Amino acid sequence: ILLTSGSLKEYKEGIPAPLISMYLESKGITPEKSDFCTILFLAEPGDKEGKAKRLVSALADLEKAFEENRPVSEILPECSSLPEEDIRDLSSRFFHFLHEKNVFSLLNTLFSSEHFPDAPMTGRKANQLWLSGKGEKCPLAEAEGRTTLEAVLPYPPGICLLAAGETWTKDILSYFLFLEEYGREFPSFMPEVVGLHKQDGKPYVWVLSKDRG
């Protein structure tokens, strides 16, 4: 696991994990998964030493580019969606945004057992109700207290935050609303959110209909 230092209070600087992932993929190296500040690499029994050296070499090249504060467009010329700014400026803006939105504290809350959502029904029952037409579209901002009919998770990292049959909580809703804002600020880094749909540019989710009759 690679931990980017911008997530740690004792370090003032770091490189966004999504940017590192994009850079490595441009070099033919695909991480297993990543989030804001961590990247997971899997080593297999048959891997050669050269594979690890290739990864370390690519990371060293990116570190050098960071130290030289090179333009992001120069580091990843094939990615036109990235902003026109130097890598230190982008990294600083990225971590400032995360800390300003207090996202690390929110994530700790989401994965604390006392904050897990209630499940008024099983996932199987939720799926049956959805297939039988007992669901309705709900604007994301109005989802608190409603029962979701499908799993909702950002990918990467691919960790389910809300399973079918569970209830949207204030904290879970806050996180997905944060992701919407994050996507507007850093569109190139926005993860795919399974279970979140768009209609006329506005996010909505499928929930149990208030009128099931």
For the regions a protein language model found, what residue spans apply to each?
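Non-catalytic terminal extensions of PLP-dependent enzymes
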Residues: I1-G213
